[in-house]
Amino acid sequence: MPPLPLEHRPRQEPGASMLVRYFMIPCNICLILLATSTLGFAVLLFLSNYKPGIHFTPAPPTPPDVCRGMLCGFGAVCEPSVEDPGRASCVCKKNACPATVAPVCGSDASTYSNECELQRAQCNQQRRIRLLRQGPCGSRDPCANVTCSFGSTCVPSADGQTASCLCPTTCFGAPDGTVCGSDGVDYPSECQLLSHACASQEHIFKKFNGPCDPCQGSMSDLNHICRVNPRTRHPEMLLRPENCPAQHTPICGDDGVTYENDCVMSRIGATRGLLLQKVRSGQCQTRDQCPETCQFNSVCLSRRGRPHCSCDRVTCDGSYRPVCAQDGHTYNNDCWRQQAECRQQRAIPPKHQGPCDQTPSPCHGVQCAFGAVCTVKNGKAECECQRVCSGIYDPVCGSDGVTYGSVCELESMACTLGREIQVARRGPCDPCGQCRFGSLCEVETGRCVCPSECVESAQPVCGSDGHTYASECELHVHACTHQISLYVASAGHCQTCGEKVCTFGAVCSAGQCVCPRCEHPPPGPVCGSDGVTYLSACELREAACQQQVQIEEAHAGPCEPAECGSGGSGSGEDDECEQELCRQRGGIWDEDSEDGPCVCDFSCQSVPRSPVCGSDGVTYGTECDLKKARCESQQELYVAAQGACRGPTLAPLLPVAFPHCAQTPYGCCQDNFTAAQGVGLAGCPSTCHCNPHGSYSGTCDPATGQCSCRPGVGGLRCDRCEPGFWNFRGIVTDGHSGCTPCSCDPRGAVRDDCEQMTGLCSCRPGVAGPKCGQCPDGQVLGHLGCEADPMTPVTCVEIHCEFGASCVEKAGFAQCICPTLTCPEANSTKVCGSDGVTYGNECQLKAIACRQRLDISTQSLGPCQESVTPGASPTSASMTTPRHILSKTLPFPHNSLPLSPGSTTHDWPTPLPISPHTTVSIPRSTAWPVLTVPPTAAASDVTSLATSIFSESGSANGSGDEELSGDEEASGGGSGGLEPPVGSIVVTHGPPIERASCYNSPLGCCSDGKTPSLDSEGSNCPATKAFQGVLELEGVEGQELFYTPEMADPKSELFGETARSIESTLDDLFRNSDVKKDFWSVRLRELGPGKLVRAIVDVHFDPTTAFQASDVGQALLRQIQVSRPWALAVRRPLQEHVRFLDFDWFPTFFTGAATGTTAAMATARATTVSRLPASSVTPRVYPSHTSRPVGRTTAPPTTRRPPTTATNMDRPRTPGHQQPSKSCDSQPCLHGGTCQDQDSGKGFTCSCTAGRGGSVCEKVQPPSMPAFKGHSFLAFPTLRAYHTLRLALEFRALETEGLLLYNGNARGKDFLALALLDGRVQFRFDTGSGPAVLTSLVPVEPGRWHRLELSRHWRQGTLSVDGETPVVGESPSGTDGLNLDTNLYVGGIPEEQVAMVLDRTSVGVGLKGCIRMLDINNQQLELSDWQRAAVQSSGVGECGDHPCLPNPCHGGALCQALEAGMFLCQCPPGRFGPTCADEKSPCQPNPCHGAAPCRVLSSGGAKCECPLGRSGTFCQTVLETAGSRPFLADFNGFSYLELKGLHTFERDLGEKMALEMVFLARGPSGLLLYNGQKTDGKGDFVSLALHNRHLEFCYDLGKGAAVIRSKEPIALGTWVRVFLERNGRKGALQVGDGPRVLGESPKSRKVPHTMLNLKEPLYIGGAPDFSKLARGAAVSSGFSGVIQLVSLRGHQLLTQEHVLRAVDVSPFADHPCTQALGNPCLNGGSCVPREATYECLCPGGFSGLHCEKGLVEKSVGDLETLAFDGRTYIEYLNAVIESELTNEIPAPETLDSRALFSEKALQSNHFELSLRTEATQGLVLWIGKAAERADYMALAIVDGHLQLSYDLGSQPVVLRSTVKVNTNRWLRIRAHREHREGSLQVGNEAPVTGSSPLGATQLDTDGALWLGGLQKLPVGQALPKAYGTGFVGCLRDVVVGHRQLHLLEDAVTKPELRPCPTP
């Protein structure tokens, strides 16, 4: 309401008195005066403080961390520049390595004095140098000249200097696999063979892999004869000749023998390994037989009608049963001896069984002392110490006062030292007494020593003495050396508080150290190292601070007294334990006490007051009060100090909480307790992985990852002892403070390090003792070793030092000291020693030579080459000749080669480096051209020099390394940029002395991967057998692959990186595969476009290999399946994208990477030697990485090798003594390029202007456009868009969704994004109050360039695409400014931000396409030079021409662009083909036979998906899997069958399951069966799989998997029957007749989890995707073998109607039922497989094993055809022909000549009979017992159908026929039971089979068989009514147990019988 006008306002307010108004006037005046005075005072104050020219400035911002995000490799660390704080560089650590002489060999073929020097060289050279082995390079294998026999094997010593022949002490962990010994005995493994040979001292060696006689165990097969193939040694099951059909059609064979028929002849020939041929039909005649008797085992052979005796027919099998003959020769079996008799035409009688060469062992009669074992070394007996012990720590104290880890280690040391050492007592010795403050006991001297070496770690700590130490290790070393008590007071540098340092967690407050209090500690008691239980970890730290003592957290939970419960014995003696504790703590145990059994009766009132400080930080009035408190609390409590407790607090305790890790700069680690040391959880235990025993804590240096190691402990993770230290185990077992110093005597030891388990040092010859300080009697240890002169020199005049040592007078004695290892930086280059070994530098060479007492001098600077002649003590000639030659031939620097005498002058181009504009601070050698040198006397020396120019000993293992950025740069080809010309190097074609890996040789390796090539043609390379493979790859080593045109160039950097990764991965896979024994190398030949990337590789094998291309492909597929999934990603299905072909033999060599194209090779071969060729592929060194090396400034590298034939660069060279002019003097850079000299004239680089490129800027480079692949991005500096932004962008997209641009705020809501969503551009931004969303109306067309423009001003924004009317939008009101602080990401975002960006923009993928222009605020971003402009990039490529422009698709079809310039047309309905040009579908009409489904491929073709039973391209081949032949499924490891789920076959499968499977395995592992609940591997499942030949039955009911594993491994190549049973949570597994293995799934307290819920299909033999199977099944590969039977409660599942899908499954043709020779069952019988054998189901009218017997029809009215009227019950004895008793039931006496044995416990039953009836019910046959619920077997008619039912004691089985029998016609019935399996066949129907549940296999009966019914059924049998009804009808031709039953004569009870009437 507006105020009233002044004139209308009333003069007085109603209700206001005059008195009030009177007093209001002066108050208002007072208020006005007060305000006026206050304002004046403020003005005066401002004027008095104001000074012109002075103003406040904000504090300067904290300078950014220039090292953040900068990665340094190979041990270098980032350091900011002192001169320019805004710049940083990677530098190597300056600290010196320890002076420890422990030579090691690096992968660069150089010897370093210790591992630290190797790592230092690796950092300085910025290249990967791996530790190949301990000991110097070039040292010979100590086992090379040692021959071990009689079971022993050669084992080199730890220092690699000597070797011993040792017998295997245990075979645990050795590879299993039966081997055949030379004595003809099978052994479970080769290790056990050697162990037996050692024990018996017999000369036994491995003869073959596998058993000596593979046919052993197959002799009992009545249907087959086993023969061992002599070539493959595989058993072959051949049919017996006696089983041939009884056809009398005699034929005459070419051996002069008449055979019954052709079947008999062929089978007899096959069993003898012969191909007998038919000469004529009928009997053999006289002219077909040899005229004379063949002697000496020769066999008659008829060829061209001329019979003669021949030895060619004496063929022997491959079984090994050695026979020693009289001629002293051992034959593999007696047949080979007979063959030798035939060929030599003389008698060679056998001498004895077994081999002949059973020479007695030289060890017979040899007695070894000190526990040594006699072994045979080089044919002589030697006593060797078996140094291998189990490693179980059970310390004992020896009689020498030394503690040994076990009795075995004591005996081993006694043997090694050659002295008698007895076990003095159990437990460790204590020769030093108590070593305090972290010192360790030195047993030899009995004194305590301090480990002094610490690994540098940037983790300073503050000690309790107030000093800062570089690391916790340095603190403990200081405490040990000064023998003082010192603890870590706090992490970081010491901070003073007043005049003192706050320790043990105290904080500084107001100049005083105050212990923080725990206000609200998290619950959870912890046990402190003082034995006190604290309520929380916070209270533990508070107590440590108050008491000023070190208290660590021992473990979570309360402290359990060691006296009670710690042993976990569970003996129930808690009362006794509590009584003991009560007494120990001053109490009295009284069980009758009302206050508790432990009575604390202390009277402390009369004790004089004397305050004491308790260990809990509480002050007690007297010590008595403390003891009373200890008794009442039952806690450890003791007097910490006399007097009142004094904490560090000089003020009352403040409620200061310990700072939580969340308040630290980098937040918390994953444990939510430890503070992170840097971004990305740097320094956290989860990323450091520090060894808990070797490190002080789980944290590490965030920059280097170095953990804080204990003294003497080294490694990044503190997991090993440093060189010169040993006994890491002592830290764990004995609580040592660190590793123990080796303390090797430098006078007697060769090295300063020692064996890690024993501490033994490597001694010089003649020196003994564990520390190499002992000499034989009468000698003393001097500077030359053990010396006879007892006089000790006093002055250096009396001593002569050798091997580079210098004399030093010290402590009154003179001694020789070897030189130090440290060299000045100027002399830190590699040198070649006179022994042919490369050393890290000259100082290391001298130190190693001195310690090893070898005369080694420096041969030359730089690494040794192949032509250096080795020699430890070179002669003067060998030393002077090369130098003399070099002085004449090298008038200018060593990196260029002069003309040799007599050669002509040539023009040489200026060498160019690979990467232009590169300044390197690390020394590099540049490769210069090499001239052809005539083969003069100096040829070898010139060759050596030429080789050194082109090679600088690259890493031998470089191709497989993850950090390869420096390997090839340091090699000649990499740094110089030129490759040696073909034919320019003259090399003597002798066998080179291999000093390093051939990868360091100038011409690389041959195809065998180990022979260095001597020339460009590979003339010295051995032949290989090559297989060419084609692989479709999706990724390698975790990196996704996308094809770009640069991959086609073998010289490109991208090709080199990709080839390295692929070759390294394939090499690892093949070396662990089934073909590894013959594998040599793999080389990438070509990369090309495919579905993703197509790689063509050549895999080289031993030329004698028996492997075929299919073997190579299968082996690689198996390895890909079982290897880690990111190693090599191949397109699915694997078998379609991994193909191998035979490629013939290759004598050609391949170098370290690949060979390049054929054209390039041809060019190289045709090039003359006078000029360096433009393209040479021979040395194929991979290009370097694009990552920036240490200490260099790198311009963008070119992707192609610069040409070397430009004429403007050629200039003559003449020999002379002057230095060559600088490379840039001739101004070689064109078009304004800037030339820069490299390394003092060794080369130059051109820095080209924009738009120019090439080695001399001669090429015009089109503007580069970045291409994005959906997971790529470019990062630029943050947008300046607080209030205004204008942006324009041009892009081309291949997909309708993707992120174009994004910039956000890391801590707030603000962001700006530009994205494609549903085919339209969307602009989003959020200023903090909510997002604004602007969507364009113009659809984005894939493949077309679009331009968008947007603007934003405060909260308003506009968007326009392709000139459309701008779309306007506004963000919600609230905040207006846009605060951005992250990088501007273009084309995508980093992976860690995907979730956040997806939530804000609804787009989680990047752009697939190109961006060619980006304008921000009228300033265009240089995308053409994005490599330099972007601050970060990932996966960005070059944008090329679009494959879909113009549109190649017909009919307006949409073109979808693919990688590598390919496209895919999405054809509309009615169009087909790759370009939609065909209007007719290739599937119309359907070309697939058998109505198989047809699928149209994207390439335009058709693919037929063949069902089970058909194969071929169009399913035109019908496989004989149905009908008369049974189907046995053959799996190859990648095939599988998909069936209906198990739950569809059995209703109550969830409760219980009984399954049986019969299979034959070829491979040791694979999936046999799997059925799950869900497709993602979660939920319930059941599986059966092979794991290393062990069967594993697994199932999960919801709480966890039950794993039931067979006890014994199964045999490969044999049929195996397995039974599975599950009832609730309990399961059982039984293999064959073996024992049952029981198991149970986990139990749940809340839910029973007893039901198996299955919903998915059943997979047999494999699965389509193993990653989607349950993890509990633990399967990753398919089954290789044959599956014969999968039976679920007797129901066969392997039938066509149950199979839903079959992939690569073929029928097995090597079973008697499926073989090509035909059905073994005659007269139309059905063959039923029974594992390796079979059974014939005969049709009506036939019987016998092969249905060969016809039944004789009885005459009408004969009593053999009986009639039954429903009351006729006839009893017979259960008669069989052969006894099949499994228990000891005696057979009854024979009744008469025709009576048979009566059986009561039967393993099998067989019945055949013919019946005729019209009845629908009735019991036909019964056998069983009369007891309640006893076993039985019955044939009955139920509802007109015949049933066979039997019960073996577990559960009845009912088999029902599908044929009606109540037809009044004669039908033949056949019923059979074998163990638990049964079958029923009526007439000609297919047999109905079934199986009883897992359990009993025999039928227990009373010995009687009833026909026609029973008077009364047994009680308790739940049988249908039909079983209680008698049979009405006729029976005849009854067969019991394959024998005819005489119905009248064999009857025991004979009621009135009558014949069956005629129908």
UniProtKB/Swiss-Prot annotation:
Region (Disordered): 951-980, 1173-1228
Residues modified to Phosphoserine: S569, S571
Effect of mutating N1783A: Abolishes formation of AGRN-LRP4 complex and MUSK activation. No AChR clustering activity
Membrane topology of the entry: Single-pass type II membrane protein
GO cellular component, one term: sarcolemma
Entry keywords, A to Z: Calcium, Cell membrane, Developmental protein, Differentiation, Disulfide bond, EGF-like domain, Glycoprotein, Heparan sulfate, Laminin EGF-like domain, Membrane, Metal-binding, Phosphoprotein, Proteoglycan, Repeat, Signal-anchor, Synapse, Transmembrane, Transmembrane helix
Domain named Laminin EGF-like: residues: 688-741, 742-788
Domain SEA span(s) in chain numbering: 1023-1145
Result for mutant: I1785A: Significant reduction in AChR clustering ability
Sequence ranges of Acidic residues compositional bias: 960-970
Subcellular location: Synapse; Cell membrane
Record-annotated membrane-spanning stretches: 27-47
Glycosites: N145, N672, N827, N957, S1726
Residues at the site labelled Alternative splice site to produce 'y' isoforms: P1642
Extracellular domain ranges by topology: 48-1959
UniProt binding sites for Ca(2+): D1831, L1848, Q1898, D1900
All copies of domain EGF-like, residue ranges: 1220-1258, 1440-1477, 1479-1516, 1709-1748
Function, as annotated: Isoform 1, isoform 4, isoform 5 and isoform 6: neuron-specific (z+) isoforms that contain C-terminal insertions of 8-19 AA are potent activators of AChR clustering. Isoform 5, agrin (z+8), containing the 8-AA insert, forms a receptor complex in myotubules containing the neuronal AGRN, the muscle-specific kinase MUSK and LRP4, a member of the LDL receptor family. The splicing factors, NOVA1 and NOVA2, regulate AGRN splicing and production of the 'z' isoforms.
Subunit structure: Monomer. Component of the AGRN-LRP4 complex that consists of a tetramer of two AGRN-LRP4 heterodimers. Interacts (via the laminin G-like 3 domain) directly with LRP4; the interaction is required for activation of MUSK and clustering of AChR and requires the 'z8' insert present in the z(+8) isoforms. Interacts (N-terminal subunit) with TGF-beta family members, BMP2 and BMP4; the interactions inhibit the activity of these growth factors. Interacts with TGFB1; the interaction enhances the activity of TGFB1.
Name of the molecule in the record: Agrin
